[in-house]
Structure formats: structure tokens, C-alpha cells
Amino acid sequence: MGGRYGINLLASDKETWSRGAIDLRDFPELLDFAVSDEILGVAAEYLGEVPVLGEMQLYVTTPMQKNVGNNFYHFDKPYSRQLKFWMAVEDVDAGNGPFTFIPAEPSKIVREKVRYVGRMTDEEVYAAVPESEKIEFTGAAGNALWADTCRCVHFGSRARSRNRVMFELQFVTPFWWAEPTFYFVPTLYDAERYKRNRMQSLALKLLSKHPPGEGHLGDYE
């Protein structure tokens, strides 16, 4: 029986839904990449304001015989706007299930015609817009994609013959209302590393928002 397994790279223990945990002091290059000028520049241009890092995940999907959950077409939760960055860690093709989405404008038609609630079958979506509208993210390891998964109807990996491994970043606006998946545990990272760069420190604002008495590395070391 296959499925999707996520490692929350911003959580420092196993109290979240994540299958794993990480100390970013051991892997500073991950956060350096997430808040690099190139990445933040794209997110800022789309969102129209300073982007805030909401997620950093590593997803592994193992082969499955039938579609479940996010293998069906859906929209992400109704945030006003968000932007996700996906990078293939290994080559992606039809055998390990490409991330598949429909651009924002035809996705609006899907939302209206299907009267969207929850998940949708391929048949429901393609009755609203032609199947030719879909875009499949395939290619060699290192290839990357940006998509607003709140506005673009999409589905995750339908791996059939081999595993798929993807690295994901989520960027939201400073007024994002939902609690991040790492809210109840501190994110262990070197806060001093980013303090001199105003854009980076703002992008990492959620990492220090924890219940009283908890916080990022800089709060207790």
C-alpha cells in the first residue's frame, strides 16, 4: 500500500503531523536557499508584498494502486493568495506521478461549474474544461515549478511504478491567518545568520511565532 509521506523541515521534533524532524543548524543551506534573493524575488513579485515562508517540506510518494486524498483534483485552503515552489529531487515522469494542475483562469471555470467542495474526479473537471488545459510537471532532478495552489486546481503524485521525491516551499503574505504546521514546536535555526538582511528576517517571521515560552534558537541560546 503506497502513499505520501512528508518531512516538515521547519519542525524540530515529532509533535506535529510530520513524519520527521530536522535541526536546521545542521543544514543551513536549506534555509539559505529558501530565503535567497532569487526565490524571495519571485515570491514578492507575485504576492505584491514581502513574502513570508509558511512551509518547507520534503515529500516522498510511494507507488499506489488507486487514487486517494490529494490524488484527486482540489484547491488548497482558501487563503487569499499563496505561492508554492516545487523542485524535483529525482527525475519525474508518468511512472512516479507528476504534480498536475490547471492554470488559474480555467480553474475559475472549474470552481464555478463543478460547485467545488472538497475533492473532484477527473471526469468532473474535464467536463468543465478540456483535459488539454492540464499541465504536468515532469523532467529531470533539479527542475522547478511555481504555482498558486489556491487558485489553480491540481492533484498530487499518482505514483504507480516508483517513488517520487519533491522539495516544497510555501510563501504567504504577512497577513496570513492560519497557524503554520510547525506552530507548536520551535524551529531550530541560526536566527543571527539572517538578521542583517531585512527581507530575509521578515520572510522568516513565522519561525519565531510560538506559544509563550517557546521560540526559535535565538530565544533560548
Annotated model-derived regions:
Residues 1-71:
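Non-heme Fe(II)-dependent double-stranded beta-helix
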Residues 49-52, 75-78, 88-98, 104-107:
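Active-site region of the double-stranded beta-helix
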Residues 56-58, 104, 149-151:
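Short, well-ordered beta-to-alpha junction loops that form the rim of enzyme active sites
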Residues 70-77, 152-156:
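Histidine-centered catalytic micro-motifs
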Residues 78-94, 138-139, 146, 170-173:
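Short, conserved beta-strand element in jelly-roll/cupin
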Residues 84, 99, 164-166:
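Structural motif
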Residues 108-221:
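Conserved double-stranded beta-helix
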